[in-house]
């Protein structure tokens, strides 16, 4: 039977972890000085006035490499706990992890063949 009072610690943690950031934003908004002017709108480059436009466009290749990095970073996050408890989990979890790695290998081969990993 589901009893709500069994989760008192969870609800307290959830409320506290939600209230603290909200309070931090509110307090910083109230205490921060309000200053507007052309100095605040200009870019700062080591004390020197910037030459040219401050906004630069990045090539899409940076984002592709970042996306591939995130995929393999998430793979590491999922495989590390599995590797630490490999001897306890058994054969079925080994097969599941093997399928997971094979799917990632297929994805990386696909990205490689599509040219997402080429720097040109």
From Swiss-Prot:
Broadest EC class assigned to this enzyme: translocase
Its EC number(s): 7.1.1.-
Assigned GO CC terms: chloroplast thylakoid membrane
Principal subcellular localisation of the protein: plastid
Reactions listed under catalytic activity: a plastoquinone + NADH + (n+1) H(+)(in) = a plastoquinol + NAD(+) + n H(+)(out); a plastoquinone + NADPH + (n+1) H(+)(in) = a plastoquinol + NADP(+) + n H(+)(out)
Keyword Transmembrane helix: yes
Cell compartments where the protein resides: Plastid, Chloroplast thylakoid membrane
Family: Belongs to the complex I subunit 3 family.
Quaternary data: NDH is composed of at least 16 different subunits, 5 of which are encoded in the nucleus.
Protein name: NAD(P)H-quinone oxidoreductase subunit 3, chloroplastic
């Amino acid at each position: 039977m589901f009893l709500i009072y069994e989760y008192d610690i969870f609800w307290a943690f959830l409320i506290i972890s939600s209230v603290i950031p909200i309070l931090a934003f509110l307090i910083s908004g109230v205490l921060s000085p309000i200053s507007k002017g052309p100095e605040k709108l200009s870019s700062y480059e080591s004390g020197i006035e910037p030459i040219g436009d401050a906004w630069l466009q990045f090539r899409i290749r940076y984002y592709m490499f970042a996306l591939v990095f995130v995929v393999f970073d998430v793979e590491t996050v999922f495989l590390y706990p599995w590797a630490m408890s490999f001897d306890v989990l058994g054969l079925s979890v080994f097969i599941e992890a093997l399928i997971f790695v094979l799917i990632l290998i297929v994805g990386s081969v696909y990205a490689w063949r599509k040219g997402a990993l080429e720097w040109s």
